[in-house]
């Protein structure tokens, strides 16, 4: 009988996780959030990540935008940060701050931290 290795894509090894697996655990790949959690926390983390779809999508979209388009008008189009202000119109705490309107990486990191908070892996700063 020939051993066939299961082909794993780039998804997180945690069952049902919507994130990409970017950290090796010695054979399987997990996302940064499951890497921070103990295995008994994985179902709760997965559920929180799935529930935060708008934040996950926003992170992916922010990563695709160049720094110039993010912070200033280009060819008559408004700065891209305005799209995210509108996306989170009902959640002003998730809109870009004044500093993040200039530095998109700061905004991306804050959204990533928001996912960690929602997954119970980080605490909100007061």
Language-model features: locations:
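Intrinsically disordered, low-complexity regulatory regions of eukaryotic proteins
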Residues: 1-126
